[in-house]
Every structure is written in C-alpha cells, then in structure tokens.
Amino acid sequence: MPDYRSKTSTHGRNMAGARGLWRATGMKDEDFGKPIIAVVNSFTQFVPGHVHLKDLGQLVAAEIQAAGGVAKEFNTIAVDDGIAMGHDGMLYSLPSRDLIADSVEYMVNAHCADAMVCISNCDKITPGMLMAAMRLNIPVVFVSGGPMEAGKVKFRGDEKAIDLVDAMVVAADDSYTDEEVAEFERSACPTCGSCSGMFTANSMNCLTEALGLSLPGNGSIVATHANRKKLFLKAGQLIVELAKRYYEQNDASILPRSIATKAAFKNAMTLDIAMGGSTNTVLHLLAAANEAEVDFTMDDIDELSRRVPVLSKVAPAKQDVHMEDVHRAGGIMAILGELDRANLLDVSVPTVHEKTLKDALDKWDIIRTEDPDVYEFYRSSPGGVPTQVAFSQNRYYSTLDGDREKGVIRNAEHAFSKDGGLAVLYGNIALDGCIVKTAGVDESILKFTGSARVFESQDAAVEAILGNEIKAGDVVVIRYEGPRGGPGMQEMLYPTSYLKSKGLGKDCALVTDGRFSGGSSGLSIGHVSPEAAEGGAIGLVEDGDTIEIDIPNRTIHLNIDDATLAHRRTVQEAKGWHPKEERKRKVSKALKVYAMHTTSAAKGAVRVL
C-alpha cells in the first residue's frame, strides 16, 4: 500500500486497538489504506463569518469519501474581532491565532492525518490555519466561508451600501439621532459571512488565492451565493487527488512549502499592496513565512511597497465598494491578471488547482479568458435578503465590471495611485519599522507634522477622543499595546472610528505599537517596533513632542535631539518598561504565557521558544 502517514495508526498487528477505535468512528475494512483527510472546520455561533459553517464540513467530507478518501472533521476556536473589540476581549484575538495553529497541529499529528481541508473565514482563523499548514507541510486546500453581503440603508433620502464600520462611526457622532443609529446597526451586517469590506478576514482569504492554496473566487464570492458551494465540493475532490499524488506518486510539488515559496509570498504581498489590504496581513504573512522557513521579511515588504501601485480601493478606503463589487470585476484573479500584465508577479509558481499561476490566470482572469462559465461565476451577486444560511440564493449581475480605467479594479496605467496601498516607515521612533495602510490615507496628510498626545492604553485614548480633548494637529500616541505590552496587541478600530466621528479623520494621526482593524483608515500607523514594553522609543515620547510623518519618503521621526532621547532612555530603564499609569486590566495566566514568548510585530509576533 502507499506509505500514508496514517499507516502508523491503521496497519500492523500492534495497531489492533487503534483500528478498533477507528472502526468505532465508522471506518470499515475497505477504508484502511485510504488517505485520511482532516476536515479542519471552525464553526461557531459566536461569529457571523462562521455561523454558517456547521454543515459545510460534512459537505466537504462527503466529497472526500466519494473521491476515495476517509474524512474526519474537527473544529477550532474562532474569535470575532468585532465583538471582542473595545474591551479586554481584544487581548485574546492575536494570541488565538497561535492557539489555532497549535490545535490543528495537535489534532493532525496525534491522529496521523494524511492531508487536510481548512475551512476558515475570519481574522485570526485563516492565519492560524495557514501557519499550521506551513508547519505540518502535508497536502492542504483552503476554502473560506466567504464575505457577507454589504448592508444597505436608506438614509436621508439616499440608499447607500454600508458595513460594520459605518455603524461604529455614526454611533459616536452626535449629529445622528438614536433612530438613525439603530437603522445603521440593523442594516450593517445583513447576512452570514466575513465583514463585507477589504478588512483582515477578506484580505487573508484573498491572499490564499495568491499563495496558490485556495481555489479562484475564494476571497470574493459572497457566502450566500449557490456558486460558493462549488468551491467546497471541489476542495473535497481536490484534496484526495493531491494526497494520492504525494503519497502514491511521490509528487512533493503539491506540498504547502513547495507552493508557498518566497516567490509566492512576494506575490501575495504584491496583491495585498495592490488591493489595499489590511495591515494585519503583514503580521500574518510574516508568521506564515516563519513557519514555512521562508526568508520573507519587512525589508521585502518595504521593497514591494515602493513599486506596486494601488489597483483597487475597497471599504474602508472607498466606502461604497465592497467584496461583492470586487467579485463582479473578476475577483482576485483579475487583480493578479493586471499585476501580471504590469510584470509585477512571478507567475511560474504552482497552485493547488493549476500547474502554474500563469495557467490559472489564463483560465480565470476575465480579461484574457473566453470561458462563459468563468464569466457567469464572476457575475454571482448578492441576494439582498438577510440570512444566516450559506448558498441560499442564486442571483446574478447582468454584466461584469471589466472597466480597467474607471472600474473597481484598474490596470496599472490607470491605477488609483502609483504608490502602494501599504507602506513601511522607519525612523528613531520605529527602528525596526511600522506599518501604515496608505490606501486609506487622504493625499492631503501623506506628510504630517503634529504634537504628541501620549496615552498608556487604548482605553485612555478613547476617553480623551470622546471627551473632545483631541484637537486638529495632534498625533495620538497609544503605547504598551504591543504583542508583549498589551499583551496581545489590541486593534485600534474604536479610536480611529471615533476620530472620524469627531471630524478629525483628516486632521490627526494615530501612532501605536498596537495594531489596527482592517476596518481602520486615516493616518493610522501601527506595529511600531520595537514596542514600548521591549524598550522601544515609542515608550520615550512625551506630551508636546513633535512627530514628523513622511509617507512618500517612508519616514517617521520624533523631533528631539539624540542626547535628550538618550537621557530619557536612561531614566526609563531605571524605572522599568511599563505604563506610567496603572491600568485596570486583568491579565490572565494564558495571556502572561503568550507575553513571555511572543516577539515583535516586525517579526510577525511569532513565538520564540
């Protein structure tokens, strides 16, 4: 028989007990010798992006069985960043990524699974499973639950598309009535699926397409559309094929580390920059590359950000455009197609579904293909009916958006900007770098000089913003919120949203060693490394200091002389690197363990053991 990993627990006289247990799960004589495929699901009723996944694992499992494999499903945890936002629950979000990676490793290795299908969707689940896939290096296919449909609200005479961030912004804006806020709240998230903009969840699901580990459409077709079911069915069929190619034909080219090479990681980052993806993707790609033992660093991201244009602007960068609009324009394969025509990709890299990325683009890029089935697939539209049920509608747009001059996806000649959607800044406040989502920054503040307002926690900053203590020209500095200092590196969606609601979105900057939600926009600079808790210079900033931000030249500078900075460091080191004011924050043993082993954001906040 083929030398499957699962043979360890299914063959030989000494494995009679293990086989007895396998039989108790439903396996028959004829199943021993087939590849055992782990169906790694993440269903939970806590998260709209995962609430519809309960039956989808068994949908995939049935296809695996029909294709000649043995499917065994298990579940991971899944944290909803939006629900965890703005309170101590957010401390658990980033650490959950590593816990998910570990739990997948534990289950797959403990039971000697041969391959896996990863059913993910939201912010830390796709990255956690991606890290596990790189770590385990067995055949894998990713398939996500898909984006939710954008909300629609009739507001003051006009109908507009909205999402979660709109509800947060209007809630803090006193010009909206309670009734109007309630209407936004009820309309913002109408269906199951990951939040409808180019936030972290959708960004990561798009990047799995560029990495070559998922099927076309994975990042863009809405969760409610019947055509999304095809991805799940195909994933079940494909994983058995990949398992047999590896174990029976000794074809290692289909393993995750053979597919997700440095060239593939650079392709993924190129896509991320071009589509203005979430800054969190930087953390997650660095972490996945670390697991894959690929030398992919902030320097690579910096180099790419200087030459890759912005080809698509989606909410929050362009509030009236959502993932359903990206799909109508050809989805991720269309953006990759434009990047290829601009000679910005390595299309020789393999994928799980085609021999090379070039082959995939020839088949799936709506500009170069003539396949009517592909056209129909990308015409899949929202249903417009609130639901928590997957594949529940089959509506289509009458036409595709193939306009590459003024459409949702542009070609390089007509790019939204020649400068990339993400940028790495360096300076005396961030020696190891920091990240800004330039696609969400107004051109008028690409260069900004302001006076520091320093806060030792996100909570204190929010209180000041809502209390009208922040004025135009301020640079809000939130520190001791990094991976170690938080611990857990909280997202700062509430501070950025509240600055918008106060009319300061284009008049202030926010700098933090924490991170930002994919829903954040504005001059929001995160991942400042080293973080304050590790002795970073952000811990030395004082109220009234001048901070100069120059995105075009990729710099951020604390405008004090070296001698003053050195004196402050000496004083701070004597006191210890901790917040100046005591925080009302309970740090559990689990979070303390995370803080003990995590590294800086510049390294993906991975653990060092």
From Swiss-Prot:
Q: Which UniProt keywords apply?
A: 2Fe-2S, Amino-acid biosynthesis, Branched-chain amino acid biosynthesis, Iron, Iron-sulfur, Lyase, Magnesium, Metal-binding
Pfam name, any one: ILVD_EDD_N
Indicate which residues the UniProt annotation says bind Mg(2+).
D81, D123, K124, E491
Reaction catalysed by this enzyme: (2R)-2,3-dihydroxy-3-methylbutanoate = 3-methyl-2-oxobutanoate + H2O; (2R,3R)-2,3-dihydroxy-3-methylpentanoate = (S)-3-methyl-2-oxopentanoate + H2O
List cellular component terms (GO).
cytosol
Q: Which cofactor does it need?
A: [2Fe-2S] cluster; Mg(2+)
Active-site residues, record numbering mapped to chain: S517
Which residues hold [2Fe-2S] cluster? C122, C195
Say yes or no: keyword Ubl conjugation present: no
Q: What class of enzyme is it?
A: lyase
One GO BP on record is:
isoleucine biosynthetic process
Q: What is its EC number?
A: 4.2.1.9
Explain how, and how many, cofactor molecules are bound: Binds 1 [2Fe-2S] cluster per subunit. This cluster acts as a Lewis acid cofactor.
Q: Which residues carry this modification: N6-carboxylysine?
A: K124
User: Which InterPro entries is this protein grouped with?
Assistant: Dihydro-acid_dehy_C (IPR042096), DihydroxyA_deHydtase (IPR004404), DiOHA_6PGluconate_deHydtase_CS (IPR020558), ILV_EDD_C (IPR056740), ILV_EDD_N (IPR000581), IlvD/EDD_N (IPR037237)
> Care to name a GO molecular-function term for this sequence?
dihydroxy-acid dehydratase activity
Annotated pathway: Amino-acid biosynthesis; L-isoleucine biosynthesis; L-isoleucine from 2-oxobutanoate: step 3/4; Amino-acid biosynthesis; L-valine biosynthesis; L-valine from pyruvate: step 3/4
Q: Per its database record, what is this protein's job?
A: Functions in the biosynthesis of branched-chain amino acids. Catalyzes the dehydration of (2R,3R)-2,3-dihydroxy-3-methylpentanoate (2,3-dihydroxy-3-methylvalerate) into 2-oxo-3-methylpentanoate (2-oxo-3-methylvalerate) and of (2R)-2,3-dihydroxy-3-methylbutanoate (2,3-dihydroxyisovalerate) into 2-oxo-3-methylbutanoate (2-oxoisovalerate), the penultimate precursor to L-isoleucine and L-valine, respectively.
Note the NCBIfam families from the entry: ilvD (TIGR00110), PRK12448.1 (NF009103)
The subunit field of the Swiss-Prot or TrEMBL record says: Homodimer.
Which PANTHER family does this entry report, sorted A to Z? D-XYLONATE DEHYDRATASE, D-XYLONATE DEHYDRATASE YAGF-RELATED
Similarity annotation: Belongs to the IlvD/Edd family.
Q: What is this protein called?
A: Dihydroxy-acid dehydratase
Gene source species: Acinetobacter baumannii (strain SDF)
Gene giving rise to this polypeptide: ilvD
